[in-house]
């Protein structure tokens, strides 16, 4: 079993799939740790979300999802107009467009993002998107 760690996918599904192919990622046996920032910038935020959601269902505890700052900003933008404006400046519209293109209401999918961890720790390492708050 390999452990595959990815981060800052930012809606770039094709590049993510390419990295997984190069690494020989096997969702049947490997462990996957995503260090966050699934959304924004790239054109396929919905595809990235859908792929990880499917993998989490299939892999269970072998798929660790850590919250990134863009994921957090996206989640909070639905409740705070200041955060929404910041999200739009950080290419949040590309995420909204991607979800709308698939007739999927992003706000209704927020529960899945709330299940992400702030960090993951095993006997060898601590995995985090950018830093730990003390």
Where are the regions that the model predicts?
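Beta-strand-turn-beta hairpins that frame and shape the catalytic cleft
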Residues: 1-4, 120-126
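N-terminal active-site segment of His-dependent metallophosphoesterases
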Residues: 1-51
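Histidine-centered divalent metal-coordination motifs
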Residues: 8-10, 69-70, 129
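A sequence-composition feature that detects small, non-aromatic residues
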Residues: 21-23, 85, 125, 130
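Active-site neighborhood of divalent metal-dependent phosphoester bond hydrolases
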Residues: 41-123, 133-134
């Amino acid at each position: 079993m390999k452990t595959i760690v990815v981060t800052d996918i930012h809606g770039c599904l094709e590049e993510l799939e390419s990295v997984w192919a190069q690494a020989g990622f096997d969702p049947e046996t490997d462990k996957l740790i995503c260090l966050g920032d699934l959304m924004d910038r790239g054109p396929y935020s919905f595809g990235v979300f859908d792929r990880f959601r499917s993998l989490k269902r299939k892999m269970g505890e072998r798929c660790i999802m850590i919250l990134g700052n863009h994921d957090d900003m996206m989640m909070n933008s639905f409740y705070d107009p200041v955060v929404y404006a910041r999200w739009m400046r950080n290419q949040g519209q590309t995420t909204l467009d991607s979800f709308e293109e698939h007739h999927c209401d992003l706000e209704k999918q927020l529960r899945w993002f709330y299940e992400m961890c702030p960090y993951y720790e095993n006997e060898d390492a601590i995995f985090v998107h950018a830093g730990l708050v003390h």
